[in-house]
Amino acid sequence: MSSMVTLREIFDKDLEDVYYFLSKNFDPGVKLDIWHSAFNRSWMHEKPNNGFMLKENEAVVGVFCALYSQRQTRKGIQNVCNTSTWFVLDTYRSHSLELMAAMLGQKGFLFTSLSTSPNVYELHRQFGFQSYVTTLIAIPNLPKLNYFSKKLEILIDPESTSKWLDAHIKQISIDHMDIPTVQQIVFRTSNETLLVIFDIRTVRGVRTTNIFYLSNPDMFYENQYEICSYFLFHNHTLFTRIHRCSISKVPTFSFEMKRNITLFYQGDIEGLSFPEFIYSEHIFFCR
């Protein structure tokens, strides 16, 4: 590495400098409060850092950000490093791979990359990442006037929802509370419960329910008409948007919005439901 350029970890005290660097050079659309909300989540006890950065004469010239989480799996506790924004100014692009090497040099983590741009797909493969290809689909929210019935109970307040969730799902719910743009709802039948974590966004001018997580994909499929009708009448959204990998079956009348979305991981994913979009930048930044 050039003596002029230094590589070091991004600590909490650096987050604002990194934010302004990315806001100026990469994505001006992210708000500072959302940025802080993402990196100040208590998803891991004593996270090591927030990623790595390149500096020259105290100025940030490149970053590779990361969100860390500690997940309960069938095999026990799994430490996950979810890499997010990887951006280096053109003049310093020769140092980009040093950021990736530093990130992967951390021991004891499963590494995921869920918003990789196509121009760095091959670089991820060269660093030993495995790939998973999915599709983004849209489900029309069709009206069903009797969606609220004895068959399907709808719970939205935290006190009511939490008592019907098992310990694992309840922790996921807790970890994603108090995020300004994110909503949660629980659908319940006599013998099943479904937690949905989602946000509302405008896609191509159309108001849409965007689902990050389903705790019970089979239940979602079986009750899709009632659930999507609820989104239509209560959230005033015309479509529900979800990745194919998050559902068990493709609903009738759904259509593809985007194909060949490639997600990456490196490490042992056995026991972890990969891919999932919780505990990641999708919750905060990806639009």
Regions found by a protein language model. Give the residues of each.
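Acyl-donor binding region in acyl/amide transferases
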Residues: 74-137, 206-263
